[in-house]
């Protein structure tokens, strides 16, 4: 799964102490926050596809195919929509899609068959912006609160 990683650094020693406690806690404790984060990020991607917006809230560039059929971009058959998953890895969580065309849709670039090549606009439906950062921070704060004696 290609995906998104989250890194956070804190100067506050109390928060650092609690994060260290999370790292050495029973795996079930920290796993719940990572699962919540994974489920949130997959849901965020699906909400973005449903709402035809990018991760930053801006409108998704429409494909010619979607315009011609008067439908939605990247969601006609739900293949890409259903392909986004998360998995717990080490001390984090990976979120992404294993579909080859997920990358070209995310980053944009030249694609198509020989003689029919074109430049596809980037449509990053997955990402970490201010809205996602706030939600992820809330999941971690909730986990720290659960770890309190």
Describe the predicted segments one by one.
Residues 1-149:
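Short, Lys/Arg-rich flexible segments
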